[in-house]
Amino acid sequence: MNLHEYQAKEILARYGVPVPPGKVAYTPEEAKRIAEEFGKRVVIKAQVHVGGRGKAGGVKLADTPQEAYEKAQAILGMNIKGLTVKKVLVAEAVDIAKEYYAGLILDRAKKRVVLMLSKEGGVDIEEVAAERPEAIHKFWIDPHKGFRPFEAREMVKRAGLEGNLNKLAQVLVALYRAYEGVDASIAEINPLVVTTDGGIVAADAKIVLDDNALFRHPDLAELREVEAEHPLEVEASNYGFAYVKLDGNIGIIGNGAGLVMYTLDLVNRVGGKPANFLDIGGGAKADVVYNALKVVLKDPDVKGVFINIFGGITRADEVAKGVIRALEEGLLTKPVVMRVAGTAEEEAKKLLEGKPVYMYPTSIEAAKAIVAMVGGAA
């Protein structure tokens, strides 16, 4: 379940992450009143469940309350990637000295939470992963031991982040506590800002909650706004898997958030552009794979699909059966490449032998193949 930026910031603040003061406005008049209340420069930010708001014109600075009114008026009602902006966050602008990226996801293969840090914050992290993968530093956290301040300080040093070491470490520990506390599947701060006076603040934030854990958080479940979500994200949620719509033309299906994120990075690195994040989870049966393909192929932007599976509790032959069902029902009208490894790998290959699905032994070969088939980035 996706949260709006202001909701993500409220959660982070609850766990001790510093965030700029901000309030939600539904009208230009409300935006003006909030700006008057703050009495300083503000940023007006569209609240929709998609990325790329800044590029679409959904983030604007305002020096005066009247400007806040005008900028909010321009943003409210705007269509960003198929979603209408119905509210904006009016937040105090921060004086930026440095911008970093910090994000947490679950790596199912390693049974660890992975912390990603980069000195290149404030930009699309997927672009950084594609163009400069060495700029993203990854650290695995044992959830049984937790994440301790001395480990956070060591990670900050290894990633080369500059600023108050202790403050940065405290923010990372608080981010992890928030991630764990609300059962998130993704928690990101981008940018994590070092201000000109040496402060640390989360200028933007993203949290995706694990739908399977919402029963433990009825207060958070009530925040769901179905009308604010992409229709495909709603459908995927109904099927029980994590799906996030992205900007590209290559559908991505994998098992485990870590593997899916790696696959997104890989496709970007070889010149492609992912159309989505879709994690079928562990132990997925054929019907789950079939439903995942249904969702991905409903996206008109998708020109081809890359299925990347590492079989542990997920059996590769079950994945193959789901693909075969989609073939038999005529769903696979776009090229599909697959890389499968692990449990029942050979059985999967035998099942798919002679089928119009392209099998590759490694992820990099599969990524290069699908990018070539769809003609590169969208």
From Swiss-Prot:
Pfam families: ATP-grasp_2, Ligase_CoA
Record Gene3D superfamilies: ATP-grasp fold, A domain, ATP-grasp fold, B domain, Succinyl-CoA synthetase domains
Description of how the protein assembles with itself and partners: Heterotetramer of two alpha and two beta subunits.
Residue ranges occupied by any ATP-grasp domain in the UniProt entry: 9-235
pH curve summary: Optimum pH is 8.0-8.4.
Superkingdom assignment: Bacteria
UniProt key word Nucleotidyltransferase: no
Residues bound to Mg(2+): N190, D204
Record-given protein name: Succinate--CoA ligase [GDP-forming] subunit beta
